[in-house]
């Protein structure tokens, strides 16, 4: 793949989708699929991991996999972003994103017209973490505005098109 950032901008979406994420050190024309769960961790990688270095080298498929990393690089290149992160499920993506912005004492304004697993997590887990979950009819803009003004809100969250009702929020 092209290593110069300016050259990457010249590539079409199709070329980017096919070739991003592959490592020139592997000399592979296709993105490899790694079907292993454990990777060798050398002394340098171990030290990086122990020091909390983000994106430290691979050691377990539970935390990192070269196949996933290739997909992340492809998505980032296609979106013109610095980086990307993939998850094994929608709930993992939703919870990670929300918990990145919310902590004990924070507030989220949302709607009950969400995927059932999201509502369950908000009602059981987020409240247990001390996060104030406030539900409104997301289509009632006056109710949304009132909820946002009555107390400091850290996140306004809705899904569109909703699952499973396919409503536009």
Write out the residue ranges for each language-model feature.
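Conserved PLP-anchoring active-site segment centered on the Schiff-base-forming lysine
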Residues: 100-117, 136
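PLP-dependent aminotransferase-class I/II
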Residues: 120-169
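N-terminal "arm"/small-domain region of PLP-dependent enzymes with the aminotransferase-like
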Residues: 2-65, 73
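Conserved N-terminal alpha-helix of the aminotransferase class I/II PLP-enzyme fold
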Residues: 43-92, 117-126
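Buried hydrophobic positions in well-ordered alpha/beta secondary-structure cores of metabolic enzymes
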Residues: 27, 75, 93, 108, ...
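Short, surface-exposed connector motifs at secondary-structure boundaries
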Residues: 78-81, 102-107, 127, 152-156
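Well-ordered alpha/beta subsegment
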Residues: 80-81, 92, 107, 141-145
């Amino acid at each position: 793949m092209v290593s110069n950032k300016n050259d990457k901008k010249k590539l079409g979406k199709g070329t980017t989708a096919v070739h991003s994420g592959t490592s020139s050190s592997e000399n592979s024309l296709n993105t490899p699929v790694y079907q292993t769960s454990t990777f060798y961790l050398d002394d340098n990688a171990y030290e990086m991991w122990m020091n909390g270095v983000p994106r430290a080298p691979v050691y377990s498929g539970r935390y990192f996999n070269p196949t996933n990393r290739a997909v992340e690089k492809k998505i980032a290149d296609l979106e013109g972003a610095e980086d990307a992160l993939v998850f094994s499920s929608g709930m993992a993506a939703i919870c990670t994103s929300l918990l990145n912005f919310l902590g004990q004492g924070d507030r989220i304004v949302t709607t009950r017209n969400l995927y059932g697993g999201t509502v369950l997590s908000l009602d059981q887990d987020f409240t247990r973490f001390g996060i104030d979950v406030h539900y409104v009819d997301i289509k009632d803009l006056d109710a949304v505005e009132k909820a946002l003004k009555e107390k400091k809100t850290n996140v306004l969250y809705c899904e569109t098109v909703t699952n499973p009702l396919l409503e536009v929020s």
